[in-house]
Amino acid sequence: MSDPRKIAYEVLNKCASAEQYSNIALDTAIKRSDLTSPDRGLLTALVYGVIERQLTLDAIIDTLCDRKADDIPPEARTLLRLGLYQLAYLDRVPDHAAVNETVNMAPKRVRGFVNAILRAFIRGGKQIPMPDKREDPIRYLSVKYSFCPALCRTFVETFGLERTEELFLAFGEHPDLTLRTNTLRITREDLLAALAGEGIHALPTKESDVGIRVCDKSPVAELYGFADGLFFVQDEASQLCVKSLDAKAGMRVLDACACPGSKSFGAAIDMQNTGCVMSCDLHRNKLSLVESGAERLGISILQTEERDARTPNDTWISQFDRVLCDVPCSGFGVFAKKPELRYKDPAASAALPDIQLAILKNASTYVKVGGRLVYSTCTLLPCENEGNVARFLEENRDFSLIEQRTLYPDINETDGFFYAVLERVR
């Protein structure tokens, strides 16, 4: 039988060395293992928990350890993070089990060191060192919520200290799985009833009239109706974005940055599978996933094309009733789903607003007069959101703003998300 702690250690080492993103490394490890359902849950909690709490755990290590940070071997740091996370955050794991299992995985040369740090944490009452909020608010946020200082600084400058703390707290919550009903095949009410019949606790989403929140931690592919294409995974914020597109039967719709395809699927379903949805992406291999997803859902009007969304296509000028630009973004609204983003310096995304604007400008040329152009991101940074919409409207008098909206994880119980709806008026 596979050991979930050992697998977690291996996955975390791969993530620490930047070999793989956590979701990919974890999915691969689970598929290769023979873990029971409870052990899969423990493995997932350990991997995501350690990554989400990395800076907090490192602060504990730095307080308890006499060595300089650079003198701690990488494998020892990973083991310490893994053991400390269980001691500090997993009440259901006994202290002795957390210590013994972690120490047993350690190479001989660091076993005593790992054991000493873990036991010192227990002896100290499991106290987490916390900087003073008033004296050093950035350091306080970084240690308490485990976001890199540069990201803390950007959020405080944008939202203020108190609102930043509210957002960081919300980003630490693990959201329910959200599904969009494939109404080509079933109603939301019937799907909810079918899931309940299988013992799955699920609820309708608050705003989207086709969304379902699955409260149980069940693998998507094992849920009732997955193989039959009765639903696909899509956050409620993305569902509302697609709804704002107002795609109707018989229309021509362009999804300029389509992968992984959920917005294209949603538009096609809203169109009752009549008309045309053109789904484009920069990478051919990603488009194959869109095609297989459409096939599972019974969508036949979707076409794919490999292309850079910034590159003009003269044959598409004024040819689409609806155009969606879900542009590449910093992702600073989906920390709960992509925990590695907590440690990304915003400076690394400084070029994104100009890239996003270039995509928006090019895509706008494909919209018919009277048609809609929807711009969306999964970030909360205004420079990628309202700022880009304002820049676009200043230079493009043929469009008017119908609506723009930011959704927040604590207020809307969705991803952090932004969308703007524009209409071509001449």
Can you describe what each PLM-predicted range is?
Residues 1-426:
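S-adenosylmethionine
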